[in-house]
Amino acid sequence: MVKAVAVLGSSEGVTGTIFFTQEGNGPTTVTGSLAGLKPGLHGFHVHALGDTTNGCLSTGAHFNPNNNEHGAPEDENRHAGDLGNVNVGDDGTVSFSITDSQIPLTGPNSIIGRAVVVHADSDDLGKGGHELSKTTGNAGGRVACGIIGLQG
């Protein structure tokens, strides 16, 4: 089993830890908890770069090795990094578990060394009709991020 972790933080007070596990060539399970967010849905994505030299802005676009349009996690035509939304409670926290087959921890499309990003707004899953729907899901600014690193 391969394991990875990302510790999220931001200048806006958002914190969290996200764990990634993958058994063999199976899907990757993503579990985590976040705090300090406004209640409601927040876009949640793996971005292409593990560069936080300019905060979350330097993490690049959504991880998209197949050059697809933005979409929902269940869509076949989607960025590999499109993980949908996390639903934050009234207390500003969320715990979640996601299983996804497009974000492996090994191989040529590994997400190790890339960033995971939480956005200010909900991801419209490419279906919102906004000019940004097919690229970012119109999910707004980047409120927290962390680099995905191998875990022992």
Curated annotation (Swiss-Prot):
Is Oxidoreductase tagged as a keyword? yes
Q: What quaternary arrangement does the UniProt entry report?
A: Homodimer.
Recorded hits in InterPro entries, A to Z, give: SOD-like_Cu/Zn_dom_sf (IPR036423), SOD_Cu/Zn_/chaperone (IPR024134), SOD_Cu/Zn_BS (IPR018152), SOD_Cu_Zn_dom (IPR001424)
Give the protein name, as stated in the record.
Superoxide dismutase [Cu-Zn]
Cofactor: bound how, per the entry note?
Binds 1 copper ion per subunit. Binds 1 zinc ion per subunit.
Give each disulfide bond as a residue pair: C56-C145
**Necessary cofactors:** Cu cation; Zn(2+)
* Composition skew (Basic and acidic residues), residue ranges: 71-81
- Please give the biological process terms from Gene Ontology that the record holds: removal of superoxide radicals
Q: What does this protein do?
A: Destroys radicals which are normally produced within the cells and which are toxic to biological systems.
Gene Ontology MF term list: copper ion binding; superoxide dismutase activity
- PROSITE patterns annotated for this entry? SOD_CU_ZN_1 (PS00087), SOD_CU_ZN_2 (PS00332)
Where does the record place it?
Cytoplasm
Enzyme Commission number(s): 1.15.1.1
Please state the gene responsible for encoding this protein.
SOD1
Assigned protein family = Belongs to the Cu-Zn superoxide dismutase family.
Entry keyword Zinc? yes
Ordered alphabetically, the record's keywords are:
Antioxidant, Copper, Cytoplasm, Disulfide bond, Metal-binding, Oxidoreductase, Zinc
Instruction: Report residues binding Cu cation.
Output: H45, H47, H62, H119
Q: Which SUPFAM superfamilies match?
A: Cu,Zn superoxide dismutase-like
Give GO cellular component annotations, separated by semicolons: cytoplasm
Binding-site residues for Zn(2+), renumbered to this chain: H62, H70, H79, D82
Stretch list, region Disordered: 62-82
Organism superkingdom:
Eukaryota
Catalyses which reaction(s): 2 superoxide + 2 H(+) = H2O2 + O2
